[in-house]
Structures are given as structure tokens and as C-alpha cells.
Amino acid sequence: MASIIIGSQWGDEGKGKLVDILSQQFDVVARCQGGANAGHTIVVDGKKIALHLIPSGILNEKASCILGNGMVIHLPTFFKEVQGLQDKGINYKGRLFVSDRAHLVFDLHQMIDAMKEAELSNGTSNDSIGTTKRGIGPCYSSKASRGGLRVCDLYSPEHFRKTFTRLVENKHKRFGSFEYDVEAELKRYQEFAEMLKPFVIDSVYYLNQAFKDGKKVLIEGAQSTMLDLDFGCYPYVTSSASSVGGACTGLGISPNKVVTQIGVVKAYTTKVGSGPFPTEQNDHVGDSLRKAGSEFGTTTGRPRRIGWLDAVVLRYTSMINDFTRLNLTKLDVLSDFEEIKIGVDYKYKGETIKSFPASLETLAQCEVVYESFPGWKCDLSHVTEYDQLPIQAKNYIKRIEELVGVPIVYIGVGVERKNLIERKELI
């Protein structure tokens, strides 16, 4: 059977750390959607390992790792990460695989991404989406319009050449003249095809066979539910299904196989890019949280937007994903605050609303209702058991559980693997 780890906010919740730790209990770790717009940073023995494509479970040398069919893969980035693993002495051979059905992100897609952002912003950031400019949206657009290329197409040279040439021609028609050496790119991808061969498998068959063999599969979600193409704050979303449904379409598995849904929740809220953010704090509180939590994007390096925890968002994402347990991360970052707040409800025109609104105009007019909590003003990094937490921290955790209706089983109190409290009695 399978378990899935999903972000419950706007990304950057700390999913990679939990995947790294829990992967020790699984035979297979798989990513189902997204591409190099994901950024997971894992700290092991004081050393940082940043991954954008390869699942965080690669650090478990007993687990196979899959880049699933729902992903979009930029091969230069993939090979750079593989080299990084090799340089760090991490064994990946024979256990890192790429789906033959995954779509390819070309440098062309990244160029188009940047041009579209510039087109939207028109010199300002008011209308831009705030993408990572990694070519993710344009690649998914090529996929949806049936003009993209998949990993398996690398091994059909004539088809690859014809489709790739047509793809470039179509982009020239849309964006005008821009420099792009088609022949050089085709030659480069001929070389990539040979380099990639040892990694390519039919991942759909592989995963379903793994289930038949009684193996345990951990699905590593990328981005987050509030960036989901359907359920996020459209159009300020990613281009894939980053909620639980994406696991089935992005891996080719039955919903019945997914039995545990773990929502990862940062103890406050962060966001990269444009779009609404109801609990955002553009003041000394936001600045202090950003500094204490080192809130800068793994993929972009941009300073993240900061706000208090939003329980309305958490109830919404929990409803969509049917979370069975939560992982509360970065609780230690709140240790310096005298007062901590949670946004518990939204009011629209004076009335409390029951659900997260689809309309961004409605959302912009919502007033956040806050509850305040006393801080604990002490270092939590040494805490290894729930009972060792100060009462103020326990009360904060308890209130989140009450507001969302899901138990918090894992609590992060630092960046290292060892800084994770596990409430085993709740599992």
C-alpha cells in the first residue's frame, strides 16, 4: 500500500525532511508531478543536500526512487543532481528510475516561461504569476496541447526531430524571432538519450508490480495543495495536480492503494510568488519570522512572503486531501515571539464564511479573525519527546488539531533529522 506526503499551504513546508526520515520504512519512493520548480533541502550531519527533481528518499540506500509519468523533467538539471549525488558518495545506481512517459522540459520552455512572465508583468510585478521560470508551465502546456515530447520519444530519433522542430516553429509564431539553435539542441538530446538509458523504465508497470509484491510505497508530493491547478488561488497556481489526486494520475495507480495522507504544515505560513495571502505580515513580525526561519526559496533564492498560520486554508486542504495525520514543521522558529497568532476564520461583509472562496475578489475583501497565544520564549532544538515541550507550545499544537480536526503526529523543532518529535501513540 501507499502513503503520500502533501503540502497543506503554499509550498516550502518542509516535506523533504519528512520524506527523508519516513523513507527508511518504505521500499519505493516516488514523485508524481511537477519538475525542477520543487526545492527540497535536507540536512544530514550538518551538510545540506538540495534536490529539485530527484525524490528526497534517495538518501535511503535501500529504497528505489521513481520520477513518475506526471513529472516534467529538465534533463540537464537531472544529470546535475545525479552528479551531485555521486560527488557526495550517495549510491543511486540500480535504484533511481525515470518514467518513460514523463514529459521533457527543454531550454526552450524556460525561455518561453521568462518571456510570458515579462509579457504579463509589462515592467511591473502586478500581473505576473511569479513562476520559478523553470519552464514548468510551458512544458505542461505543450503536453496538454499534444505537442510535447516524452522520455520514450528520445529513442525514436525521426519522430523526436520532427516534433521538436515543430514545437520551436510554433513558439516562433507566437513570440516572434528569438535565438535558438535547433540542431545543437537535437545533438545534445541524442547524447542525453544514451546517458539516460540506465534510468528509464515503465514506471506504471513497476509501481503496480511493487504493490503486487507487497512492497510499501511512499509518494512525495511537490509544491502544495494551495498551488494546485484546480484548488489553488487560480491563476496563481502551478500547472499540475499537487493535491492527492495527482498521485493517481501522475503514477498510474488506483486511489485504493493510497491509505495514508500526511499533510505537512509549517507553524506559520510562507509563500513565494504573486497572489493572495490573507494572513501576510508586511511588518516587523514578517521580517523577524523570515530571518529566524531563513525563509528564502530553495529554487529561486527569493525572500518568501510571511504570515501567521491560516486555519481556514488548513481546513480546506485537509478536506480535499482527507489528511489522516499532520506534520507540524518549524515550531522552533516561533520561540522568540511573545505573542503568536492563528487566523481561525474569514469574515466576508461581516459574516463568517464556511469555506475558502474561489473568487480572488471575494478573498481580497475577507477579514481574517485571529486568536492569540502566549509564546514560550525558549529553545526547542533539544526537545525529543512531546512531554518535554513547554505548555504554551502544547497549547498551540492542541488548538491547531482542534481547528483542523486532524492529529499532529510529527513535530519539527530544528533542521536536522534528529529534530523531529514523533507521537507514536497517535499512529
From Swiss-Prot:
Active site (record annotation): D12 (proton acceptor), H40 (proton donor)
Pfam families in the record: Adenylsucc_synt
EC number(s) from the headed UniProt entry: 6.3.4.4
Cofactors: Mg(2+)
Pathway in which this enzyme or protein is active: Purine metabolism; AMP biosynthesis via de novo pathway; AMP from IMP: step 1/2
Free-text remark on how the cofactor is bound: Binds 1 Mg(2+) ion per subunit.
Primary localisation category: cytoplasm
Catalyzed chemical reaction(s): IMP + L-aspartate + GTP = N(6)-(1,2-dicarboxyethyl)-AMP + GDP + phosphate + 2 H(+)
Localization per record: Cytoplasm
GO cellular component, one term: phagocytic vesicle
Binding residues for Mg(2+): D12, G39
PROSITE patterns, per database record: ADENYLOSUCCIN_SYN_1, ADENYLOSUCCIN_SYN_2
One MF term in the entry's GO annotations: GTP binding
Binding-site residues, GTP: 11-17, 39-41, 304, 330-332, 412-414
Keywords assigned: Cytoplasm, GTP-binding, Ligase, Magnesium, Metal-binding, Nucleotide-binding, Purine biosynthesis
Keyword Cytoplasm among UniProt keywords: yes
Binding-site list for substrate: T298, T299, T300, G301, R302, P303, R304
InterPro entries linked to this entry: Adenylosuccin_syn_GTP-bd, Adenylosuccin_syn_Lys_AS, Adenylosuccinate_synth_dom1, Adenylosuccinate_synth_dom2, Adenylosuccinate_synth_dom3, Adenylosuccinate_synthetase, P-loop_NTPase
Binding site for IMP: D12, E13, G14, K15, N37, A38, G39, H40, T132, R146, Q223, T238, R302
Record function comment: Plays an important role in the de novo pathway and in the salvage pathway of purine nucleotide biosynthesis. Catalyzes the first committed step in the biosynthesis of AMP from IMP.
Complex and partners: Homodimer.
Similarity comment text for this entry: Belongs to the adenylosuccinate synthetase family.
HAMAP family linked to this entry: Adenylosucc_synth
Name by which UniProt lists this protein: Adenylosuccinate synthetase
Species name: Dictyostelium discoideum (Social amoeba)
